[in-house]
Protein backbone atom coordinates (compact mmCIF):
# COMPACT_ATOMS: atom_id res chain seq x y z
CA UNK A 1 0.00 0.00 0.00
CA UNK A 2 2.79 2.42 0.86
CA UNK A 3 4.37 1.89 -2.54
CA UNK A 4 1.03 2.59 -4.20
CA UNK A 5 0.55 5.80 -2.21
CA UNK A 6 4.06 6.99 -3.06
CA UNK A 7 3.47 6.22 -6.73
CA UNK A 8 0.16 8.07 -6.72
CA UNK A 9 1.60 11.16 -5.03
CA UNK A 10 4.48 11.26 -7.52
CA UNK A 11 2.06 10.88 -10.41
CA UNK A 12 -0.17 13.70 -9.17
CA UNK A 13 2.84 16.00 -8.77
CA UNK A 14 3.98 15.14 -12.28
CA UNK A 15 0.44 15.57 -13.55
CA UNK A 16 0.34 19.21 -12.48
CA UNK A 17 2.26 20.11 -15.65
CA UNK A 18 0.07 19.51 -18.69
CA UNK A 19 -0.28 20.71 -22.22
CA UNK A 20 3.27 21.96 -22.77
CA UNK A 21 3.75 19.58 -25.71
CA UNK A 22 0.18 18.39 -26.30
CA UNK A 23 -0.39 19.99 -29.72
CA UNK A 24 1.35 21.65 -32.65
CA UNK A 25 -1.84 22.53 -34.51
CA UNK A 26 -2.06 26.01 -36.09
CA UNK A 27 -5.78 25.91 -35.29
CA UNK A 28 -4.92 26.08 -31.56
CA UNK A 29 -4.29 29.77 -32.23
CA UNK A 30 -8.04 30.38 -31.99
CA UNK A 31 -10.21 30.34 -28.87
CA UNK A 32 -8.60 28.63 -25.90
CA UNK A 33 -6.77 26.11 -28.08
CA UNK A 34 -7.45 22.41 -28.57
CA UNK A 35 -10.05 21.17 -26.05
CA UNK A 36 -9.73 17.93 -24.06
CA UNK A 37 -12.80 15.76 -23.43
CA UNK A 38 -11.36 14.18 -20.23
CA UNK A 39 -12.33 10.56 -20.77
CA UNK A 40 -10.64 7.44 -19.34
CA UNK A 41 -8.52 5.36 -21.68
CA UNK A 42 -10.99 2.49 -22.04
CA UNK A 43 -13.78 4.81 -23.18
CA UNK A 44 -11.55 6.67 -25.63
CA UNK A 45 -11.14 3.39 -27.51
CA UNK A 46 -14.95 3.26 -27.72
CA UNK A 47 -15.08 6.52 -29.65
CA UNK A 48 -15.17 8.74 -26.57
CA UNK A 49 -18.42 7.65 -24.90
CA UNK A 50 -18.82 8.20 -21.16
CA UNK A 51 -22.07 9.90 -20.11
CA UNK A 52 -24.01 6.63 -20.07
CA UNK A 53 -21.10 4.45 -18.94
CA UNK A 54 -21.00 2.88 -15.48
CA UNK A 55 -18.26 0.38 -14.59
CA UNK A 56 -16.12 -0.79 -11.68
CA UNK A 57 -13.10 -1.07 -14.01
CA UNK A 58 -12.76 2.63 -14.94
CA UNK A 59 -12.75 6.04 -13.27
CA UNK A 60 -15.06 8.23 -15.35
CA UNK A 61 -14.70 11.96 -14.48
CA UNK A 62 -16.86 12.90 -17.47
CA UNK A 63 -19.88 11.51 -15.55
CA UNK A 64 -19.70 12.22 -11.78
CA UNK A 65 -22.74 10.03 -11.08
CA UNK A 66 -20.73 6.95 -12.12
CA UNK A 67 -18.36 6.87 -9.12
CA UNK A 68 -20.67 4.67 -7.02
CA UNK A 69 -20.16 1.85 -9.53
CA UNK A 70 -16.81 1.15 -7.81
CA UNK A 71 -16.37 -1.92 -5.61
CA UNK A 72 -17.07 -1.20 -1.95
CA UNK A 73 -13.58 -2.28 -0.80
CA UNK A 74 -11.45 -1.06 -3.70
CA UNK A 75 -9.18 1.95 -4.11
CA UNK A 76 -8.55 2.81 -7.76
CA UNK A 77 -6.17 5.12 -9.54
CA UNK A 78 -5.54 5.68 -13.21
CA UNK A 79 -2.70 7.35 -15.10
CA UNK A 80 -2.45 7.86 -18.86
CA UNK A 81 -0.03 9.19 -21.45
CA UNK A 82 -0.39 9.83 -25.17
CA UNK A 83 1.58 10.22 -28.39
CA UNK A 84 0.19 12.27 -31.29
CA UNK A 85 1.47 12.30 -34.88
CA UNK A 86 -0.15 14.86 -37.19
CA UNK A 87 0.14 15.78 -40.87
CA UNK A 88 -0.88 19.38 -41.66
CA UNK A 89 -1.67 20.52 -45.18
CA UNK A 90 -2.71 23.88 -46.63
CA UNK A 91 -1.99 26.18 -49.57
CA UNK A 92 1.59 26.66 -48.32
CA UNK A 93 2.46 22.94 -48.30
CA UNK A 94 2.48 20.00 -45.89
CA UNK A 95 4.38 19.30 -42.69
CA UNK A 96 4.45 16.66 -39.96
CA UNK A 97 4.60 17.07 -36.19
CA UNK A 98 4.89 14.67 -33.24
CA UNK A 99 3.81 15.40 -29.67
CA UNK A 100 3.71 13.53 -26.38
CA UNK A 101 1.81 14.36 -23.23
CA UNK A 102 0.69 13.13 -19.82
CA UNK A 103 -3.08 12.85 -20.25
CA UNK A 104 -4.47 12.59 -16.72
CA UNK A 105 -4.07 11.24 -13.20
CA UNK A 106 -7.24 10.22 -11.31
CA UNK A 107 -8.21 8.29 -8.18
CA UNK A 108 -11.44 6.91 -6.76
CA UNK A 109 -12.61 5.14 -3.59
CA UNK A 110 -15.88 4.36 -1.75
CA UNK A 111 -16.85 6.38 1.31
CA UNK A 112 -19.84 4.32 2.48
CA UNK A 113 -20.35 0.92 0.91
CA UNK A 114 -21.80 1.36 -2.57
CA UNK A 115 -23.89 4.38 -1.64
CA UNK A 116 -21.30 7.19 -1.58
CA UNK A 117 -18.01 7.40 -3.50
CA UNK A 118 -15.33 10.02 -4.09
CA UNK A 119 -13.05 10.78 -7.03
CA UNK A 120 -10.32 13.35 -7.66
CA UNK A 121 -7.72 14.04 -10.30
CA UNK A 122 -5.82 16.44 -12.50
CA UNK A 123 -6.10 16.73 -16.28
CA UNK A 124 -5.75 19.27 -19.10
CA UNK A 125 -8.70 21.39 -20.23
CA UNK A 126 -7.07 22.89 -23.32
CA UNK A 127 -3.69 23.13 -25.03
CA UNK A 128 -2.07 25.74 -27.28
CA UNK A 129 1.07 25.08 -29.30
CA UNK A 130 1.89 26.43 -32.75
CA UNK A 131 4.62 28.14 -34.76
CA UNK A 132 4.27 29.21 -38.39
CA UNK A 133 5.27 32.05 -40.71
CA UNK A 134 3.42 33.63 -43.64
CA UNK A 135 5.15 35.78 -46.28
CA UNK A 136 3.58 38.40 -48.55
CA UNK A 137 4.26 41.76 -50.18
CA UNK A 138 2.78 45.24 -50.51
CA UNK A 139 3.15 45.93 -54.17
CA UNK A 140 6.57 45.36 -55.69
CA UNK A 141 8.56 47.40 -53.18
CA UNK A 142 7.77 46.05 -49.72
CA UNK A 143 8.15 42.41 -48.76
CA UNK A 144 7.29 41.18 -45.29
CA UNK A 145 6.73 38.09 -43.16
CA UNK A 146 4.34 37.54 -40.26
CA UNK A 147 5.50 34.98 -37.68
CA UNK A 148 2.90 33.48 -35.31
CA UNK A 149 3.61 31.45 -32.18
CA UNK A 150 1.68 30.36 -29.12
CA UNK A 151 1.98 28.02 -26.16
CA UNK A 152 0.34 27.13 -22.86
CA UNK A 153 -3.09 25.91 -21.92
CA UNK A 154 -5.48 25.43 -19.02
CA UNK A 155 -5.28 22.65 -16.43
CA UNK A 156 -8.08 21.51 -14.14
CA UNK A 157 -8.04 19.79 -10.76
CA UNK A 158 -11.32 18.19 -9.73
CA UNK A 159 -12.96 16.55 -6.75
CA UNK A 160 -16.28 14.76 -7.07
CA UNK A 161 -18.91 12.92 -5.03
CA UNK A 162 -21.49 10.40 -6.18
CA UNK A 163 -24.58 9.19 -4.29
CA UNK A 164 -26.85 6.22 -4.94
CA UNK A 165 -30.20 7.63 -3.84
CA UNK A 166 -31.88 4.28 -4.52
CA UNK A 167 -31.11 0.98 -6.26
CA UNK A 168 -31.55 2.48 -9.72
CA UNK A 169 -30.62 6.19 -9.52
CA UNK A 170 -27.27 7.89 -8.88
CA UNK A 171 -26.45 11.58 -8.58
CA UNK A 172 -23.01 13.18 -8.68
CA UNK A 173 -21.15 16.46 -8.90
CA UNK A 174 -17.60 17.56 -9.74
CA UNK A 175 -16.01 20.79 -8.55
CA UNK A 176 -13.17 21.99 -10.80
CA UNK A 177 -10.39 24.44 -10.07
CA UNK A 178 -8.98 25.71 -13.35
CA UNK A 179 -5.66 27.48 -13.79
CA UNK A 180 -3.05 28.18 -16.45
CA UNK A 181 -2.03 30.71 -19.04
CA UNK A 182 -1.91 31.13 -22.80
CA UNK A 183 0.77 33.24 -24.50
CA UNK A 184 0.46 34.25 -28.15
CA UNK A 185 2.91 36.32 -30.19
CA UNK A 186 2.97 37.92 -33.64
CA UNK A 187 6.04 39.47 -35.28
CA UNK A 188 5.91 41.59 -38.44
CA UNK A 189 9.27 41.81 -40.23
CA UNK A 190 10.18 43.64 -43.43
CA UNK A 191 13.04 42.76 -45.73
CA UNK A 192 13.70 46.49 -46.18
CA UNK A 193 16.01 47.68 -43.39
CA UNK A 194 14.39 51.11 -43.33
CA UNK A 195 11.16 49.67 -41.88
CA UNK A 196 10.77 48.72 -38.23
CA UNK A 197 10.03 45.23 -36.96
CA UNK A 198 6.91 45.12 -34.77
CA UNK A 199 6.13 42.38 -32.23
CA UNK A 200 3.00 41.90 -30.14
CA UNK A 201 2.67 39.41 -27.28
CA UNK A 202 -0.63 38.66 -25.49
CA UNK A 203 -0.88 36.65 -22.27
CA UNK A 204 -4.08 35.41 -20.62
CA UNK A 205 -3.90 33.91 -17.10
CA UNK A 206 -6.91 32.34 -15.37
CA UNK A 207 -7.88 31.03 -11.93
CA UNK A 208 -11.47 29.90 -11.63
CA UNK A 209 -14.01 27.40 -10.30
CA UNK A 210 -16.81 25.57 -12.09
CA UNK A 211 -19.25 22.72 -11.36
CA UNK A 212 -20.55 19.73 -13.31
CA UNK A 213 -23.63 17.72 -12.30
CA UNK A 214 -24.39 14.16 -13.35
CA UNK A 215 -27.39 11.83 -13.21
CA UNK A 216 -27.69 8.14 -14.10
CA UNK A 217 -30.61 5.70 -14.19
CA UNK A 218 -29.64 2.03 -14.31
CA UNK A 219 -31.55 -1.23 -14.31
CA UNK A 220 -30.45 -4.87 -14.39
CA UNK A 221 -32.63 -7.82 -15.32
CA UNK A 222 -31.10 -11.23 -15.68
CA UNK A 223 -27.77 -10.76 -17.47
CA UNK A 224 -28.78 -7.45 -19.05
CA UNK A 225 -28.04 -3.93 -17.79
CA UNK A 226 -29.06 -0.62 -19.31
CA UNK A 227 -27.85 2.82 -18.18
CA UNK A 228 -29.22 6.25 -19.09
CA UNK A 229 -27.12 9.28 -18.15
CA UNK A 230 -27.07 13.05 -18.35
CA UNK A 231 -24.67 15.87 -17.44
CA UNK A 232 -25.01 19.63 -17.01
CA UNK A 233 -22.69 22.59 -16.40
CA UNK A 234 -23.89 26.16 -16.02
CA UNK A 235 -22.22 29.04 -17.84
CA UNK A 236 -19.46 30.48 -15.65
CA UNK A 237 -17.42 33.68 -15.84
CA UNK A 238 -13.84 33.14 -14.69
CA UNK A 239 -11.22 35.24 -12.94
CA UNK A 240 -8.39 36.29 -15.24
CA UNK A 241 -5.59 38.72 -15.82
CA UNK A 242 -4.24 39.69 -19.22
CA UNK A 243 -1.75 42.02 -20.76
CA UNK A 244 -0.47 42.98 -24.19
CA UNK A 245 3.14 43.94 -24.90
CA UNK A 246 4.05 45.70 -28.16
CA UNK A 247 7.71 45.99 -29.13
CA UNK A 248 9.21 48.01 -31.96
CA UNK A 249 12.75 48.94 -32.87
CA UNK A 250 12.38 52.23 -31.00
CA UNK A 251 9.96 51.63 -28.08
CA UNK A 252 8.03 49.11 -25.94
CA UNK A 253 4.46 49.42 -24.69
CA UNK A 254 2.74 47.22 -22.07
CA UNK A 255 -1.03 47.46 -21.63
CA UNK A 256 -3.16 45.71 -19.01
CA UNK A 257 -6.43 44.68 -20.64
CA UNK A 258 -9.93 44.32 -19.20
CA UNK A 259 -11.98 41.84 -21.24
CA UNK A 260 -14.68 39.41 -20.12
CA UNK A 261 -14.37 35.64 -20.57
CA UNK A 262 -16.75 32.77 -19.77
CA UNK A 263 -16.90 28.99 -19.77
CA UNK A 264 -19.93 27.64 -21.67
CA UNK A 265 -23.06 25.92 -20.54
CA UNK A 266 -22.57 22.18 -21.16
CA UNK A 267 -25.23 19.50 -21.44
CA UNK A 268 -25.35 16.00 -22.80
CA UNK A 269 -26.90 12.56 -22.62
CA UNK A 270 -25.82 8.98 -23.15
CA UNK A 271 -27.06 5.41 -23.08
CA UNK A 272 -25.29 2.07 -22.70
CA UNK A 273 -26.31 -1.57 -22.80
CA UNK A 274 -24.30 -4.38 -21.19
CA UNK A 275 -24.75 -8.11 -21.51
CA UNK A 276 -23.20 -10.35 -18.83
CA UNK A 277 -20.13 -8.08 -18.46
CA UNK A 278 -19.08 -9.33 -21.89
CA UNK A 279 -20.64 -6.98 -24.44
CA UNK A 280 -21.18 -3.22 -24.03
CA UNK A 281 -22.72 -0.90 -26.62
CA UNK A 282 -22.92 2.85 -25.96
CA UNK A 283 -23.55 6.22 -27.59
CA UNK A 284 -23.39 9.85 -26.39
CA UNK A 285 -24.29 13.37 -27.42
CA UNK A 286 -22.81 16.51 -25.84
CA UNK A 287 -23.10 20.25 -26.52
CA UNK A 288 -20.77 23.00 -25.30
CA UNK A 289 -22.70 26.21 -25.98
CA UNK A 290 -19.78 28.55 -26.69
CA UNK A 291 -22.01 30.74 -28.88
CA UNK A 292 -23.57 32.30 -25.77
CA UNK A 293 -20.32 32.97 -23.89
CA UNK A 294 -18.18 36.09 -23.67
CA UNK A 295 -14.75 35.90 -25.28
CA UNK A 296 -12.79 39.16 -25.47
CA UNK A 297 -16.10 40.90 -24.69
CA UNK A 298 -17.62 39.26 -27.75
CA UNK A 299 -15.06 40.76 -30.13
CA UNK A 300 -14.22 37.30 -31.49
CA UNK A 301 -16.84 34.77 -32.51
CA UNK A 302 -17.29 31.36 -30.91
CA UNK A 303 -20.00 28.85 -31.75
CA UNK A 304 -21.63 25.81 -30.17
CA UNK A 305 -19.58 22.62 -30.24
CA UNK A 306 -21.60 19.44 -30.82
CA UNK A 307 -20.08 16.00 -30.29
CA UNK A 308 -21.54 12.58 -31.17
CA UNK A 309 -19.82 9.33 -30.15
CA UNK A 310 -20.59 5.62 -30.33
CA UNK A 311 -18.64 2.52 -29.39
CA UNK A 312 -18.62 -1.15 -28.50
CA UNK A 313 -16.57 -3.30 -26.08
CA UNK A 314 -16.33 -7.09 -26.07
CA UNK A 315 -14.76 -9.57 -23.65
CA UNK A 316 -15.36 -13.25 -24.35
CA UNK A 317 -15.15 -14.32 -20.69
CA UNK A 318 -13.77 -12.04 -17.92
CA UNK A 319 -13.01 -15.04 -15.63
CA UNK A 320 -11.62 -17.46 -18.22
CA UNK A 321 -8.26 -19.21 -17.72
CA UNK A 322 -7.46 -18.39 -21.34
CA UNK A 323 -5.79 -14.97 -21.43
CA UNK A 324 -7.06 -14.05 -24.91
CA UNK A 325 -10.62 -14.67 -23.74
CA UNK A 326 -10.12 -12.27 -20.79
CA UNK A 327 -8.90 -9.43 -23.03
CA UNK A 328 -11.14 -6.49 -23.91
CA UNK A 329 -11.65 -5.50 -27.56
CA UNK A 330 -13.00 -2.05 -28.37
CA UNK A 331 -14.14 -0.05 -31.42
CA UNK A 332 -15.68 3.39 -31.79
CA UNK A 333 -16.42 6.45 -33.94
CA UNK A 334 -16.84 10.14 -33.15
CA UNK A 335 -17.81 13.36 -34.88
CA UNK A 336 -17.58 16.88 -33.47
CA UNK A 337 -18.00 20.40 -34.80
CA UNK A 338 -15.53 23.22 -34.15
CA UNK A 339 -16.17 25.79 -31.43
CA UNK A 340 -14.35 28.62 -33.24
CA UNK A 341 -15.92 30.33 -36.23
CA UNK A 342 -12.49 31.50 -37.46
CA UNK A 343 -11.52 27.99 -38.48
CA UNK A 344 -14.75 26.03 -38.73
CA UNK A 345 -13.63 22.44 -39.34
CA UNK A 346 -15.42 19.26 -38.25
CA UNK A 347 -13.40 16.54 -36.54
CA UNK A 348 -14.10 12.94 -37.59
CA UNK A 349 -12.39 10.01 -35.87
CA UNK A 350 -12.37 6.22 -35.66
CA UNK A 351 -10.92 4.37 -32.69
CA UNK A 352 -9.90 0.90 -31.63
CA UNK A 353 -8.19 -0.47 -28.56
CA UNK A 354 -7.48 -3.34 -26.24
CA UNK A 355 -7.60 -4.01 -22.52
CA UNK A 356 -4.93 -6.27 -21.06
CA UNK A 357 -5.80 -7.54 -17.55
CA UNK A 358 -2.80 -8.42 -15.41
CA UNK A 359 -2.88 -11.84 -13.79
CA UNK A 360 -3.86 -12.05 -10.10
CA UNK A 361 -4.01 -8.24 -9.66
CA UNK A 362 -6.80 -5.75 -10.22
CA UNK A 363 -4.98 -3.84 -12.95
CA UNK A 364 -5.89 -3.37 -16.60
CA UNK A 365 -3.54 -1.83 -19.16
CA UNK A 366 -5.63 -0.14 -21.85
CA UNK A 367 -4.41 0.98 -25.25
CA UNK A 368 -6.21 3.23 -27.73
CA UNK A 369 -5.43 3.92 -31.38
CA UNK A 370 -7.29 6.78 -33.05
CA UNK A 371 -7.21 8.04 -36.61
CA UNK A 372 -8.88 11.37 -37.25
CA UNK A 373 -9.34 14.09 -39.83
CA UNK A 374 -10.05 17.79 -39.37
CA UNK A 375 -10.66 20.07 -42.30
CA UNK A 376 -12.73 21.09 -45.25
CA UNK A 377 -12.46 22.45 -48.74
CA UNK A 378 -9.96 25.31 -48.98
CA UNK A 379 -8.99 25.10 -45.29
CA UNK A 380 -6.15 23.81 -43.17
CA UNK A 381 -6.43 20.02 -43.16
CA UNK A 382 -5.13 17.77 -40.40
CA UNK A 383 -4.79 14.00 -40.43
CA UNK A 384 -3.69 12.59 -37.11
CA UNK A 385 -2.82 9.34 -35.38
CA UNK A 386 -3.13 9.27 -31.60
CA UNK A 387 -1.94 6.50 -29.30
CA UNK A 388 -3.05 6.49 -25.65
CA UNK A 389 -1.99 4.03 -22.97
CA UNK A 390 -3.29 4.00 -19.41
CA UNK A 391 -2.98 1.83 -16.32
CA UNK A 392 -6.21 1.44 -14.33
CA UNK A 393 -5.03 0.04 -11.00
CA UNK A 394 -7.38 -1.36 -8.34
CA UNK A 395 -6.31 -2.50 -4.87
CA UNK A 396 -8.31 -3.88 -1.93
CA UNK A 397 -7.36 -1.23 0.62
CA UNK A 398 -10.44 -1.64 2.83
CA UNK A 399 -10.41 -5.41 3.21
CA UNK A 400 -9.56 -6.78 6.66
CA UNK A 401 -7.75 -10.10 6.49
CA UNK A 402 -8.53 -12.70 9.12
CA UNK A 403 -5.59 -13.98 11.18
Give the role of each language-model region.
Residues 20-403:
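Subset of outer-membrane beta-barrel
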Amino acid sequence: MKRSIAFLVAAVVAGCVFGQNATSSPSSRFGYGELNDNLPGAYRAMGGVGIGMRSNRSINPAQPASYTACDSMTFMFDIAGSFLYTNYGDAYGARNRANGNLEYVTLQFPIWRRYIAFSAGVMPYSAVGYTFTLADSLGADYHYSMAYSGDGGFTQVYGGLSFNICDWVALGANAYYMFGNITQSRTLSFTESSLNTVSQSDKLTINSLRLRYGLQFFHTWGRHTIVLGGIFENKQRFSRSEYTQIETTTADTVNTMSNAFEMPMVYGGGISYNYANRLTIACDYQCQDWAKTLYFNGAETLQARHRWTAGVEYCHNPVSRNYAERMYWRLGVNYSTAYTADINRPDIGVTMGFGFPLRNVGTIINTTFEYGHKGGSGQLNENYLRFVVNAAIAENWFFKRKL
